[in-house]
From Swiss-Prot:
Organism, scientific name: Paraburkholderia xenovorans (strain LB400)
Example of a GO MF term: rRNA binding
Biased amino acid composition, Acidic residues: 188-203
Region annotated Disordered, chain positions: 1-31, 178-203
UniProt record similarity statement: Belongs to the DarP family.
General function of this protein: Member of a network of 50S ribosomal subunit biogenesis factors which assembles along the 30S-50S interface, preventing incorrect 23S rRNA structures from forming. Promotes peptidyl transferase center (PTC) maturation.
Protein name: Dual-action ribosomal maturation protein DarP
Protein location: Cytoplasm
Gene Ontology BP terms: assembly of large subunit precursor of preribosome
Length: 203
């Protein structure tokens, strides 16, 4: 007696393809991309005015973003932000990529500026707390005027003790900020420079 073998059909796990034979993106992928474009549009709306001018936006997107910034009504703004997202989805891939690059560049510069401001604030606190900190600072920033630094530190301490407006406290911040210059040469670098100078004279 022969036994019949039951053949079960197995659903294909391969991704769907369109009429041209290309893989269709999954629904979850499409949803994720829509969300990312919506976030990109929201980031553009939140940019400062001067930064927004540097963004490579097509005219339609530029108009939509500026309108969203102008609207103050909560519900009206929400609808406009959604519209910005729809405009974002109509952009070419290269247009979206250019916007991401410009935003990444802006955010990178912004982070660097913030980090520098924090460094200036920490340096000011060190200078006000420890006299030896000025010597270290001058060694690392040879372009800074040490006499001006001492005067600002002394006056900033005095105005703090007397509860006066922080005029010299702010001026000390600017002095530190403007002190950047070429780093001081190490001993070996100085020796190399002297050797080069001697060689030039002997030539």
């Amino acid at each position: 007696m022969t036994r019949k073998t039951r053949i079960q059909t197995i659903e294909s796990a391969e991704p769907e393809v369109d009429e041209n034979g290309y893989d269709r993106p999954s629904k979850s992928q499409l949803k994720r991309e829509m969300h990312e474009l919506q976030e990109l549009g929201a980031a553009l709306i939140a940019l400062p005015k001067d930064a927004l001018k540097r963004m490579p936006m097509p005219e339609k997107l530029d108009d939509a973003v500026r309108e969203a910034r102008r609207i103050t009504d909560h519900e009206g703004k929400r609808r406009q932000v959604q519209y910005v997202g729809r405009v974002m989805r109509s952009l070419l891939d290269e247009e979206t990529a250019a916007l991401r690059t410009a935003l990444d560049t802006y955010n990178g510069v912004n982070k660097a500026e913030t980090a520098k401001l924090h460094w200036i604030e920490r340096t000011r606190e060190k200078l006000l707390a420890d006299d030896a900190a000025l010597t270290d600072f001058i060694r690392q920033h040879p372009n800074a005027d040490p006499q001006q630094g001492r005067t600002l530190i002394r006056n900033a301490r005095k105005e703090a003790q007397q509860s006066k407006p922080p005029r010299y406290f702010r001026e000390l911040f600017q002095w530190i900020k403007n002190a950047d210059g070429p780093p001081a040469q190490t001993d070996s670098e100085a020796d190399d420079a002297q050797d080069d100078e001697d060689d030039d004279r002997d030539a």
